[in-house]
């Protein structure tokens, strides 16, 4: 398995570097993740530190040797992340639900040799997930992985995001080479 770890949100340089050092010392983490841009449901919530946090990810690579990843949702994010040496890009659940957003990212990475991870959409819609994968693949990206985070559910549940395992199982059946 590929172990991805790090803070959901990059809040300070110290937080990012301290977390990365501790994870690197474990020797079990393959990819350091930190959210630089955070799409929030409502305005006036913390939406990430923005591109200044990308310099922190560069320092993580330099100081720990860990490869880095962050979520991108639009062209500017892609260009800034690549300019700062981010190793792997990921599409978040809120981006995956919007074919226009996925296409914008796909156009921005066309011709770039970078791995892309694609989270399942927020709602349990296999076709949306497949559509995102196909758009990224058609942009010339061959190293695609998927992240199953579970799905939103309106009601009582013991999980924040309900797994609905039949959906990722069907995805793997249709795309057996996906990681």
Language-model features: where?
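Short, well-ordered coil/turn segments that N-cap beta-strands
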Residues: 1, 28-30, 62-68, 85-87, ...
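Active-site mouth loops of central-metabolism enzymes
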Residues: 1-18, 42-48, 66-72, 92-93, ...
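Conserved, mostly hydrophobic/aromatic
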Residues: 6, 32, 81, 118
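Catalytic cores of alpha/beta
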Residues: 13-21, 75-85, 126-133
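Glycine-rich, proline-tolerant flexible connector loops at the mouths of alpha/beta enzymes
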Residues: 33-51
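Catalytic beta/alpha-barrel core
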Residues: 45-49, 66-78, 87-101, 114-126, ...
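Charged helix-capping and loop-helix junction motifs
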Residues: 47-55, 160-167
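Catalytic alpha/beta core domains of metabolic enzymes, predominantly
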Residues: 101-179
């Amino acid at each position: 398995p590929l172990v991805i770890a790090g803070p959901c949100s990059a809040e300070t340089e110290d937080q990012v570097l301290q977390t990365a050092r501790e994870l690197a010392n474990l020797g079990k983490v393959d990819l350091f993740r930190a959210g630089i841009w955070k799409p929030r449901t409502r305005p006036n919530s913390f939406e990430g530190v923005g591109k200044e946090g990308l310099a922190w990810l560069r320092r993580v690579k330099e100081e720990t040797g860990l490869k880095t990843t962050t979520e991108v949702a639009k062209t500017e994010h892609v260009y800034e992340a690549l300019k700062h040496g981010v190793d792997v890009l990921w599409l978040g659940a809120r981006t995956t639900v919007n074919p226009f957003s996925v296409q914008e990212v796909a156009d921005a990475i066309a011709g770039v040799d970078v791995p892309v991870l694609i989270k399942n959409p927020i709602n349990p819609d296999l076709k949306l997930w497949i559509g995102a994968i196909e758009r990224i693949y058609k942009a010339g990206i061959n190293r695609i992985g998927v992240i199953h985070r579970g799905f939103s559910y309106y009601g009582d549940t013991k999980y924040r995001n309900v797994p609905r395992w039949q959906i990722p199982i069907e995805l793997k059946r249709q795309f057996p080479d996906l990681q």
